[in-house]
Design a protein with these regions (language model features):
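Serine-dependent carboxylesterase/thioesterase catalytic core
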Residues: 153-154, 162
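The feature marks non-catalytic terminal segments
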Residues: 2-4, 74-92, 101-105, 133, ...
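Active-site beta-strand->loop->alpha-helix modules in alpha/beta enzyme cores, enriched
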Residues: 1-151, 277-279
Length: 281
């Protein structure tokens, strides 16, 4: 990990994605003296949600009169405080508030009439312009919001580092990055010293835990996944896997198996939750 006063920006589709996926790396950068920001794209409160959007709230046990997104923004602030990073919330609506009518639509590609990228580009541009390191999702799982973010960041800052989306990667470990993600080296960042902090931060998203992690639970899944990623890449310790330029990967202390002359080994067996057909986030 390179110490210094650089600026790192993680572009998160939803209020939890960056912390679930690369929270250990973000905590390590903050501990090394970097300024770290998590810029979450789709955080707007919507006073009159569509039936599907409201269902995404009700099925988590949250009453209809609660401002669901305000609750989630507060959870994100708590999680970021644990990691020592700064939260930034862009006031754009999530896909269920943009005309996606059901879970199947969320994973069927970006709608032709979805113009949110036109608003996302100018909202993101100033945050990306000042960053020395950019983190963004590979869009594993093919959620429309993740794909919009991946494509937008790839257009603005193709030199980013691309994370494997959690919890989707735990359900689909062999999934490939969305085709719009730039080619790059895959490497593992050792988060052994920061895994406990990542788990604590992830547990701040109380409204999402049962829905996203099921009976396995957030702590076992994140610990198992970090060990799995290390085994898959032939690396020791607990690892978050990222893809990108080798010079940027070296800034975070990430190691490529090829660079070490190591063979990739099969992923360790771990209990998995099935994909939920009603998945909203």
């Amino acid at each position: 990990m390179t110490t210094g006063s650089g600026v790192a920006v993680a572009v998160s589709p939803h209020l939890d994605d960056a912390v679930f996926s690369v929270g250990g790396t973000l905590a390590a950068l903050a501990a090394a003296g970097w300024t770290v920001r998590v810029v979450t794209c789709f955080t707007a409160s919507v006073p009159d949600p569509s039936p599907f959007a409201l269902a995404c709230q009700l099925d988590k046990g949250i009453a209809a009169d609660v401002d669901y997104m305000a609750l989630r923004r507060a959870e994100d602030e708590a999680a970021c405080a644990v990691l020592g990073v700064q939260p930034v919330h862009l006031p754009l609506p999530e896909a269920p508030h943009r005309g996606y009518p059901d879970p199947a639509a969320l994973f069927a590609g970006v709608r032709g009439d979805d113009r949110v990228a036109a608003a996302l580009v100018p909202a993101l541009r100033p945050h990306l312009a000042e960053a020395d390191l950019i983190f963004a999702p590979q869009a594993l799982g093919d959620h429309a919001d993740h794909r919009v973010v991946s494509e937008t960041v790839a257009a603005l800052r193709p030199d980013g580092l691309w994370w494997r989306d959690v919890p989707y990667v735990s359900r689909q470990p062999a999934a490939s990055p969305w085709r719009g993600v730039p080619d790059g080296v895959e490497a593992g960042a050792d988060i052994s010293d920061h895994l406990a902090r990542k788990v604590t931060a992830a547990a701040s998203y109380h409204s999402q835990l049962g829905f996203q992690f099921g009976q396995i639970g957030v702590a076992p899944l994140l610990r198992n996944l970090a060990a799995e990623e290390a085994a898959r890449l032939g690396l020791p310790g607990a690892v978050e896997a990222l893809r990108g330029r080798m010079d940027h990967l070296r800034l975070i202390g990430a190691v490529s198996p090829g660079a070490r002359g190591m063979d990739v080994v099969p992923s360790a067996a771990v209990q998995r939750e099935p994909l939920k057909d009603r998945h909203c986030d």
